[in-house]
Amino acid sequence: MGRNQRERKQERERRKQERRWTARVFEGPPTGPDVVTPSFQEVVAALETMPQELTWDQIAPEVVPLFQRVRPYHPEMPEQLRMVVPPGLSVGFGVDIGPAFITVSPEMADEWGIGPDEILERALANLEARMDGVRPRDVYDGSIGDVPVRMLQSPTGSASTYVLVPDALGRIFGTHRQLVLAPMRNLLLSLPIGADRDFAAWLFDEIASQDPNCLAPAAFVIGDGQLSLEPLGESYGAA
């Protein structure tokens, strides 16, 4: 066991004994004027509702898949448990506590005795259950210039990963082939399949540039329950 891993384990044991959470704040870049984020107090209040020892049975209903943001995490943040899922997407996992996620680390999975495949299966099932609650009125229909754009925003950071369940997403956006963008964790945009890719890249960048936690520039093609991945180009994206 490496020093950092050992120190984190000792810190968890100390918190268990004290029966309270501790918080460390790592300041990041400011968000854009149109991005709303939870306050520190809201995050701490949510953490205080969680048990000190997070067992699999307790947190399994709230585990969801997460796409990795572009901006690197602080080096003192826990390592993330990650998997690569079709069609070549890197996926991590978080415990949804409302205003934030608790990162699932390899260490936590080892303590639970739960393998990554089982965590992925449960996370996707939880995701699909959330998607079942999306109503037609939750999808905003608009246009930018002469391009129709449909938007879906989730109250938590799950919307971006809805593409991992293309059948369920088809019930929301329709089963036709379409281009889907996920510039932020809680936002999906649907464009016509024939939309100009330079326009799509510009739109992605316009939104992602406001969010320091933006996702990697990529486009998803969905339709008939299938999912494929398209690059948006190295010159785009708010890295």
State what each model feature region is.
Residues 81-85, 168-175:
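Short, surface-exposed loop and linker segments with low hydrophobicity and enrichment for Pro/Ser/Thr
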Residues 115-119, 160-161, 195, 199:
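Short amphipathic alpha-helical segments
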Residues 123, 127, 131, 168-173, ...:
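Hydrophobic, Leu/Ile/Phe/Ala-enriched alpha-helical segments that form helix-helix packing faces
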Residues 144-150, 181-189:
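Short glycine-rich, basic-tinged beta-strand/loop micro-motifs
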Residues 18-157:
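Charged, alpha-helical interface segments at or near domain boundaries
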Residues 157-171:
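Short amphipathic alpha-helix segments
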Residues 1-22:
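Short Lys/Arg-rich cationic patches that frequently serve as NLS/NoLS or arginine-rich RNA/DNA-binding motifs
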Residues 174-179, 186-239:
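C-terminal structured domains
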